[in-house]
Amino acid sequence: MKKPVDFFAMKENGEKITMITAYDYPSAKNVEQAEADMILVGDSLGMVVLGYDSTVPVTMNDMIHHTKAVKRGAPNTFVVTDMPFMTYHGSVDETIQNARKIIQESGAHAVKLEGAGEVVNKIARLTEAGAPVVAHLGLTPQSVGLTGSYKVRAKSVQEAQELIDNALAVEAAGAIAIVLEAIPRQLAEKVTKALTIPTIGIGAGLETDGQVLVYHDIIGYGINRRAKFVKAYADIDETIEPALKNYVNDVKELAFPEVKHSFTMAEEDLKGLYGRE
């Protein structure tokens, strides 16, 4: 299993880092078999798996439950788990206790926090306490309630400079990596060159040290539409829907189960049942 020191070496050597989300045992198993470098148990599970319209309703228990399943499916892959909405915006002590609970109970190797500002101090304190932290800048889904959209971030000079400053701040605080989401590729390149820690892009161009995409987006499973930055590698929904419809039709038409799908008992044993009704 790769560790933070390996990710630092990959950045230094120019080897791209691959991260994929996973939310349960089978998806995690698939991701590990694909030899991805990292798994992100994102609070995006709220929208992708639980059917919420944002990540805000996701709880600590949700993250722990799903991370435990992921760990069983991918025991040899570095796992990062999101700290959900408002679990790191209270006191430092509350943040540390919440991170401790996630790491101890789920087995996650690191936690991910969105934003900068007051979050920078939380990253520093978590790092001091021995909890590896991945930062997340640019489009931060937990803040969409305030920003009102999932549009590209940091397109103006002022916003771009602020993001660079924030990236340097979370690096100084001890973050082991930074996810850069939905920012101009030129800015992502500048940030990547300015930092010694790896950058993982999602909608941030080719120049980041690595890439992350949502499992369901990659394979086309249960999604309504793909974002611009997502490349379609499969569309398994096109296979799933007819398969399920065929099953329903076979049952209705007495075409399933066939004899080969059934169990039998010896004829002499069957005869022994006669007259016992």
Curated annotation (Swiss-Prot):
Major place of residence: cytoplasm
The residues listed in the UniProt record as binding 3-methyl-2-oxobutanoate, with positions renumbered to this chain, are: D43, S44, D82, K112
**Keyword terms:** Cytoplasm, Magnesium, Metal-binding, Pantothenate biosynthesis, Transferase
Q: How is the cofactor bound?
A: Binds 1 Mg(2+) ion per subunit.
Give the UniProt record's GO annotations in the biological process aspect: pantothenate biosynthetic process
- Part of which pathway? Cofactor biosynthesis; (R)-pantothenate biosynthesis; (R)-pantoate from 3-methyl-2-oxobutanoate: step 1/2
Spell out the Pfam families in the cross-references.
Answer: Pantoate_transf (PF02548)
Per the record, its GO cellular-component terms are:
cytoplasm
EC top class, in one word?
Answer: transferase
The compartments listed are: Cytoplasm
Q: What is its EC number?
A: 2.1.2.11
Q: Please list the reactions this protein catalyses.
A: 3-methyl-2-oxobutanoate + (6R)-5,10-methylene-5,6,7,8-tetrahydrofolate + H2O = 2-dehydropantoate + (6S)-5,6,7,8-tetrahydrofolate
Question: Where is Mg(2+) bound in this sequence?
Answer: D43, D82, E114
Q: What one GO molecular function would you report for this record?
A: 3-methyl-2-oxobutanoate hydroxymethyltransferase activity
Q: Where is the active site?
A: E181 (proton acceptor)
Q: Tell me the domain of life.
A: Bacteria
Cofactor field: Mg(2+)
Family, according to the entry, reads as follows: Belongs to the PanB family.
Role, per record: Catalyzes the reversible reaction in which hydroxymethyl group from 5,10-methylenetetrahydrofolate is transferred onto alpha-ketoisovalerate to form ketopantoate.
NCBIfam families registered for this protein in UniProt: panB, PRK00311.1
Q: Self-association or partners: how does it assemble? A: Homodecamer; pentamer of dimers.
Q: What is this protein called?
A: 3-methyl-2-oxobutanoate hydroxymethyltransferase
